[in-house]
From Swiss-Prot:
<dbReference type="GO" id="GO:0008776">
    <property type="term" value="F:acetate kinase activity"/>
</dbReference>
<dbReference type="GO" id="GO:0006083">
    <property type="term" value="P:acetate metabolic process"/>
</dbReference>
<feature type="binding site">
    <location>
        <begin position="207"/>
        <end position="211"/>
    </location>
    <ligand>
        <name>ATP</name>
    </ligand>
</feature>
<comment type="similarity">
    <text>Belongs to the acetokinase family.</text>
</comment>
<dbReference type="Pfam" id="PF00871">
    <property type="entry name" value="Acetate_kinase"/>
</dbReference>
<keyword id="KW-0963">Cytoplasm</keyword>
<keyword id="KW-0460">Magnesium</keyword>
<feature type="binding site">
    <location>
        <position position="10"/>
    </location>
    <ligand>
        <name>Mg(2+)</name>
    </ligand>
</feature>
<feature type="active site" description="Proton donor/acceptor">
    <location>
        <position position="147"/>
    </location>
</feature>
<dbReference type="GO" id="GO:0006085">
    <property type="term" value="P:acetyl-CoA biosynthetic process"/>
</dbReference>
<dbReference type="InterPro" id="IPR004372">
    <property type="entry name" value="Ac/propionate_kinase"/>
</dbReference>
<feature type="binding site">
    <location>
        <begin position="329"/>
        <end position="333"/>
    </location>
    <ligand>
        <name>ATP</name>
    </ligand>
</feature>
<feature type="binding site">
    <location>
        <position position="17"/>
    </location>
    <ligand>
        <name>ATP</name>
    </ligand>
</feature>
<comment type="pathway">
    <text>Metabolic intermediate biosynthesis; acetyl-CoA biosynthesis; acetyl-CoA from acetate: step 1/2.</text>
</comment>
<feature type="site" description="Transition state stabilizer">
    <location>
        <position position="240"/>
    </location>
</feature>
<dbReference type="GO" id="GO:0005524">
    <property type="term" value="F:ATP binding"/>
</dbReference>
<keyword id="KW-0808">Transferase</keyword>
């Protein structure tokens, strides 16, 4: 094989996503998932040349290590050994320490672990994945790509909370933002679509999936984003509440709720699921709405209204606007949700291109609306975070 491939690893608390990415085309030539780690039904599946294979992972512990060990044999069996030139790890939180992709060594791994207080579900798992991969692939250079890194260009006025400064200086409480790798990728692709240098381009990127966030991008740099200290703030999401009066937390604690109950509710029982009382999945919301389900209809209305509010507010962060970018599973595929968001932004002069909007789904990109008033477009750009991780890893070789 003459192609240069990067093995991209996204290690979660009970799962492990992986893909072998062509660093030039961005194509995933192999992709897979390990899931239910720590449970008896732990398993690992992968897709190669259209064929899906699934195996059980035995034992009750060290499933990350076992899964990555199996990756060694799998890549050898499929003939990727000579083609893989690096391993790229998706790491959720880099704090203020990591502003760009870095080559992994023991010091970097310990720094990632030290940031676990900021991302207790994600960073420890990311470090476990790193240690397992370093042991399994000792000869391959490995790199860490951080979800927060793209947002480190935010000005102080955007990332500073209106709280006692000691909370920032002593505890690091500030806006960090997430989905940075996705916002970075789609903004570069959007600049190509409108034939304008990214350094001169201004976008509002709208990543809508089970997790969702908006990012204001000025001259190619993030200048504000809706997620904050944690991924809980900002937009309404699948099970997360988004922006909420913090006084509600005190109120619930006084009502006898435990801290765990409160944060479980806000993280896992809110959003689409909480408002609809039905499901966290946007597709299920739309289906139920068509059948007249009041909760689903309200969830749809709250979600689309809040997205539109954030998009409109981020005009204040930009001198001009070239485009609104829709991406993520919902943003790329849900015609009704995109249409309603644009309808809520009619004051900005956006007129839907019906054929363009209907065509920009299921992996297709395209311009879906235009505003003569702003001289701007709305567009759909499918995200490819794995491609960014592969590219940035190869660039540091």
């Amino acid at each position: 094989m003459n192609n240069e491939y990067v093995l991209v690893i996204n290690s979660g608390s009970s799962s492990l996503k992986f893909a072998v990415i062509d660093s030039v085309s961005g194509d995933a030539v192999l992709s897979g998932l390990g899931e239910c780690f720590g449970l008896e039904d732990a398993r690992m599946s992968w897709k190669y040349q259209g064929q899906k294979t699934e195996i059980a992972i035995e034992g009750n512990e060290n499933h990350h290590k076992i899964a990555i060990g199996k990756l060694v044999g799998l890549t050898e069996e499929l003939g990727f050994t000579d083609g893989i030139v690096a391993i790229g790890h998706r790491i959720v939180h880099g704090g203020e320490k990591f502003t760009k992709t870095v080559r992994i060594n023991e010091e970097v791994t310990k720094e990632i672990e030290s940031l676990s207080d900021l991302a207790p579900l994600h960073n420890p798992a990311g470090a476990i994945g790193i240690r397992a991969a370093v042991e399994a692939f000792p000869s391959l250079p490995q790199f860490a790509v951080f979800d927060t890194a793209f947002h480190q260009t935010m000005p102080k006025r955007a990332y500073t909370g209106a709280i006692a400064k000691e909370l920032y200086t002593d505890f690091g409480v500030r806006r960090y933002g997430f989905h940075g790798t996705s916002h970075y990728f789609v903004s570069r692709e959007a600049a190509k679509m409108i034939n304008k240098p990214i350094e001169e381009s201004n976008f509002i990127s709208v990543h809508l999936g089970n997790g969702a966030s908006v990012c204001a991008i000025k001259d190619g740099n993030s200048v504000d984003t809706s997620m904050g200290f944690t991924p809980l703030s900002g937009l309404m999401m699948g099970t997360r509440c988004g922006d909420l009066d913090p006084g509600i937390i005190e109120y619930l604690l006084k009502k006898g709720w435990s801290q765990e109950q409160v944060f479980n509710s806000l993280n896992k029982e809110s959003g689409f699921l909480g408002v609809s009382g039905l499901t966290s999945d946007a597709r299920g919301i739309l289906e139920a709405m068509e059948e007249g389900h009041e909760g689903a209809t309200l969830a749809f209305q709250v979600f689309t209204y809040r997205v539109a509010k954030y998009v409109a507010s981020y005009l204040a962060a930009l001198d001009s606007l070239d485009g609104i970018i829709f991406t993520g599973g919902i943003g790329e595929n849900s015609l009704p949700i995109r249409r309603e968001i644009l309808s809520n932004l009619k004051i900005l002069g956006f007129v839907e291109d019906v054929a363009g909007n209907e065509g920009a789904r299921f992996g297709a990109d395209g311009i879906i609306a235009k505003s003569e008033m702003l001289n701007a477009v709305a567009m759909v750009i499918p995200t490819n975070e794995e491609f960014v991780i592969a590219q940035q890893s190869v660039e540091l070789l």
